[in-house]
Design a protein with these regions (language model features):
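A glycosyltransferase accessory/donor-loop signature
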Residues: 56-200
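A short secondary-structure junction signal
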Residues: 1, 7-11, 33-37, 62-68, ...
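GT-A fold catalytic core of metal-dependent nucleotide-sugar glycosyltransferases
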Residues: 1-30, 44, 53-54
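A generic structural signal for short, solvent-exposed coil/turn residues
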Residues: 15-17, 44-46, 89, 112-113
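Intrinsically disordered, low-complexity boundary segments flanking structured domains
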Residues: 6-14, 38-41, 82-85, 104-111
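A recurrent flexible, glycine/aromatic-enriched loop bordering the glycosyltransferase active site
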Residues: 40-51, 78
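A short, conserved beta-to-alpha structural element at the edge of catalytic cores
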Residues: 18-43, 135, 139-145, 149-150
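Short, surface-exposed beta-edge/turn micro-motifs
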Residues: 20, 48-50, 83, 117-118
Length: 200
C-alpha cells in the first residue's frame, strides 16, 4: 500500500456528513486547475481519491457506482480515471477534511518533514517506497519499518524494469551523489530506450 496510518483516526467516525456523500481531502492546487480546464469541474477544490470516507447511504441513494462506471465507459478525456470521475460526480457533495487525514507526499520532488499530527501518509506520485529509486528519501525508511513487520517483509524492493524506471533511478542516484550507480543506470536507460524504439 502507498498509505501508512500513523495516528488514530477515531475522530473520523464522529464527523457530521449531513447530506454529503463522502469525506475528502483536497489535492494540490495544480490539480484543481487541471480539472477545471479538462472537464469544467464546478468546485472550489479537487480531492485525492486515495483516501475517502464514504457515507454509504448517500452513496447508494445517488447511485454513484453505476454513474462512475458509465462515465468511464463513455468518456475518454479523464487523465486520472476514477479520481476525475468521482470529483465530477461528487462536486459540492463532499465534506472537506483536514490535510492530516491524507498527507499527500511526492518522493520525487518533496523533501520537507511531515507534521507530527499526520494520520494517513500518502506516498502519491510515480515514485513509491517499494521501488529501488525511491530508497534515498528519508520518508522511505518509515515505510520500510512497517514493511519489515508485515507478512511481506521478505518481498524484495522493486528494481527498474523499463527505460522510464531506469531514468528515474539515474536521476535519483545522481541527486544523492551516487555517481557510479547513476552512470550505470544511465547506460541501462539508454540501451533499453533504444531497444524499445526499435520494436515499434
Amino acid at each position: 500500500s502507498d498509505i501508512l496510518c500513523l495516528n488514530s483516526f477515531e475522530n473520523l467516525f464522529h464527523q457530521n456528513f449531513s447530506s454529503n456523500i463522502a469525506g475528502v481531502v483536497s489535492d494540490h492546487d495544480s490539480m484543481l486547475n487541471y480539472a477545471q480546464k479538462a472537464f469544467n469541474l464546478n468546485s472550489n477544490y479537487y480531492f485525492n481519491s486515495g483516501f475517502l470516507i464514504i457515507n454509504l447511504i448517500n452513496w447508494e441513494k445517488n447511485n454513484i457506482s453505476d454513474k462512475a462506471i458509465s462515465l468511464l465507459l463513455n468518456k475518454n478525456n479523464f487523465k486520472y480515471y476514477d479520481q476525475d470521475v468521482l470529483n465530477l460526480l461528487l462536486a459540492n457533495k463532499t465534506l472537506l477534511l483536514e490535510k492530516k487525514y491524507n498527507t499527500i507526499y511526492h518522493l520525487a520532488d518533496m523533501n520537507t518533514p511531515i507534521s507530527n499530527d499526520t494520520i494517513f501518509l500518502h506516498y502519491s506520485g510515480s515514485v513509491k517506497p517499494w521501488q529501488s529509486w525511491g530508497q534515498y528519501h528519508f520518508l522511505t525508511s518509515l515505510w520500510l519499518k512497517y514493511k519489515n513487520n508485515s507478512p511481506w517483509k521478505n518481498v524484495p524492493i522493486l528494481q527498474p524494469q523499463t527505460y522510464k524506471q531506469a531514468k528515474f533511478m539515474t536521476r535519483m542516484s545522481y541527486r544523492n551523489k551516487k555517481f557510479i550507480k547513476s552512470i550505470y543506470w544511465y547506460i541501462k536507460y539508454s540501451f533499453w530506450k533504444i531497444k524499445s524504439k526499435l520494436k515499434v
